Amino acid sequence: MPDEIYYDNSATTRTREESAKLVYEMLTDCYGNPSSLHRRGFLAQQRLDKAREQTAETLGCQSGEIYFTSGGTEADNIAILGAARAQQRMGKKIVTTAIEHDAVLNTVKFLEGEGWEIVRLKPDREGKITAQQVLDAVDNQTVLVSMMAVNNEVGTILPIEAAARAIALKKAPALLHVDAVQA
């Protein structure tokens, strides 16, 4: 029997040996700033480009569509603020859920202070958001629907596909932002 049973893998998972070795290699052999013009910077940029290409291939998109950030909070901020600013001429309504990560909730609260309408869908007793809730909330003024794929506290799987269908059905100009950090 193990000394410890670890139940927090959704927050942080033990690093695989292969990953730890690669991180060590990058920290000791490839430590150049990828924006620098010297040899170490060039090598770091090559490794970064390769990682971007591998990620794009895995996701089935173009390498120019891949952005590396410091973590989920920064990524959520960039996605939500960027989408809101880009879409604001078509409406100023964002649909999200009341059970999002603080990275999302704080960002939409900031936008609310700027006059945006924020609809926060409330979960049922089991922590679930229904497809009907999303469908009812989305309209032609909705420019963004932001929801996590899996809730970071209770593990609820949110209706991402239903959100995409609701946007299409309502012909809303909305983009769909999915925080998949816990998925």
Report the location of each language-model feature:
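Pyridoxal 5′-phosphate
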Residues: M1-A183
